[in-house]
């Protein structure tokens, strides 16, 4: 290998040095990107964990709102039935 380096021209030596520097910079950049992606992954996992903690609370609120909707529908149904009975009582002959 040393014989090959001695036989290289000045331009080739410069190219090899620059290539080594660029490869080193690329390696450092890739390491930094990997570290930042690991940090992002940890943050996302923590966010998902917090969201899962609220899952039970959201189910309780969902049951509450569904119960309110069904209660409103029952009230409307009872209200319509009561108004029909009142109409029948006021007008028993159906006129």
UniProtKB/Swiss-Prot annotation:
Which keywords does the record carry? Cell cycle, Cell division, Centromere, Chromosome, Chromosome partition, Cytoplasm, Cytoskeleton, Kinetochore, Microtubule, Mitosis, Nucleus
Please provide the Gene Ontology terms (biological process) for this protein.
Answer: attachment of spindle microtubules to kinetochore; cell division; mitotic sister chromatid biorientation; protein transport along microtubule to mitotic spindle pole body
Question: Single GO molecular-function term?
Answer: microtubule plus-end binding
Gene Ontology CC annotation, any one: spindle microtubule
InterPro entries on file: DASH_Dad1
Top-level taxon of origin: Eukaryota
Q: What is its main location?
A: nucleus
Its localization reads: Nucleus; Cytoplasm, Cytoskeleton, Spindle; Chromosome, Centromere, Kinetochore
Q: What does this protein do?
A: Component of the DASH complex that connects microtubules with kinetochores and couples microtubule depolymerisation to chromosome movement; it is involved in retrieving kinetochores to the spindle poles before their re-orientation on the spindle in early mitosis and allows microtubule depolymerization to pull chromosomes apart and resist detachment during anaphase.
How it assembles, according to the record, is: Component of the DASH complex consisting of ASK1, DAD1, DAD2, DAD3, DAD4, DAM1, DUO1, HSK3, SPC19 and SPC34, with a stoichiometry of one copy of each subunit per complex. Multiple DASH complexes oligomerize to form a ring that encircles spindle microtubules and organizes the rod-like NDC80 complexes of the outer kinetochore. DASH complex oligomerization strengthens microtubule attachments. On cytoplasmic microtubules, DASH complexes appear to form patches instead of rings.
The record's similarity note reads: Belongs to the DASH complex DAD1 family.
Which protein are we looking at? DASH complex subunit DAD1
């Amino acid at each position: 290998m040393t014989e090959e380096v001695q036989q290289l021209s000045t331009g080739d030596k410069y190219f090899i040095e620059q290539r080594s520097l660029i490869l080193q910079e690329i390696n450092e950049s890739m390491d930094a990107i990997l570290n930042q992606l690991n940090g992002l992954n940890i943050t996302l996992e923590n966010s998902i964990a917090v969201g899962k903690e609220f899952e039970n609370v959201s189910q309780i609120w969902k049951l509450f709102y569904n119960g309110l909707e069904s209660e409103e529908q029952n009230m409307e149904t009872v209200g319509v039935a009561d108004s029909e009975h009142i109409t029948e009582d006021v007008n028993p002959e159906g006129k």
